[in-house]
């Protein structure tokens, strides 16, 4: 299929974000932007402003900056990985779609390159179509929805709007499940099989789930499908949720408590996979890989290992590009018949 002039299509791969540097000022700026989003913290604005500015931002950035410094190389691990994913998805899609003038851009909800800045670039270079792929396998109002909000804010400011596709999530896509299962098998081929495989997901407050956020249920489906793909028995794996913040109840079971319980029950070897993350970041590299290893071993456990996120594995690139390609195929058909 060919067109008189190649239609311009932009694909945006968007992740949560990261500070610009592993320094206290940079981390404070990032946390302020992130924790000021009412999608993330559902507390009355005035009350949360007091808590954030008087009790969180004066103290938390120092500890978080120290944690970032422990995993930082030339840049944030997440940003480096998202940039590599973007380049490889671009190469894949360019090979398969000569009919489009195609660009793939990275974006972050918080920090740089910010989604708002990416959308402003599109305003000066009108597109036929924009495809947004949030790099969150399981939709949540706390992670994916802020990207919808960014588009909702941008759309009223534009005159010549593009067509828009948002890929909501892919928590049970067969290619996603297979890629996760293969990553576990590849790791275990080198390091052996543990007594327990723990699939740990970032948590959300229980009240958010009670109000209709489908995230926790989608995490459970992902975990169950991965366990089935690996032919695991019920006592060989578990699901848990990490990174709770504040005093309210979050979705359970909690990763740290489950690991301590396993250690006390005599479990000697654990491997941890986090299918909520498309790119390794502070939470996986520092909290899951280091903090939780110490927690498990101090409670009497033995071997503990974190299995890396899919990152830029070829199976992951094939998945991400395939999700976009399905929409490009539909767009090709639509443009050819209008």
UniProtKB/Swiss-Prot annotation:
Primary location recorded for the protein, binned into one broad class: cytoplasm
Keywords (A to Z) from UniProt: Cytoplasm, Heme biosynthesis, Iron, Lyase, Metal-binding, Porphyrin biosynthesis
Keyword flag Lyase: yes
Residues reported in the UniProt entry to bind Fe cation: 202, 283
GO cellular component, one term: cytoplasm
EC number, as in UniProt: 4.98.1.1
Subcellular location(s) of the protein: Cytoplasm
Pfam families, per the entry: Ferrochelatase (PF00762)
Catalytic reaction equation(s): heme b + 2 H(+) = protoporphyrin IX + Fe(2+)
Keyword Lyase: yes
Enzyme class: lyase
InterPro entries: Ferrochelatase, Ferrochelatase_AS, Ferrochelatase_C, Ferrochelatase_N
GO MF terms, alphabetically ordered: ferrochelatase activity; metal ion binding
Pathway: Porphyrin-containing compound metabolism; protoheme biosynthesis; protoheme from protoporphyrin-IX: step 1/1
Biological processes annotated in GO: heme biosynthetic process
SUPFAM superfamilies attached to this UniProt entry: Chelatase
Role: Catalyzes the ferrous insertion into protoporphyrin IX.
Family to which the UniProt record says this protein belongs: Belongs to the ferrochelatase family.
Stated name of the protein: Ferrochelatase
Gene name, Swiss-Prot/TrEMBL: hemH
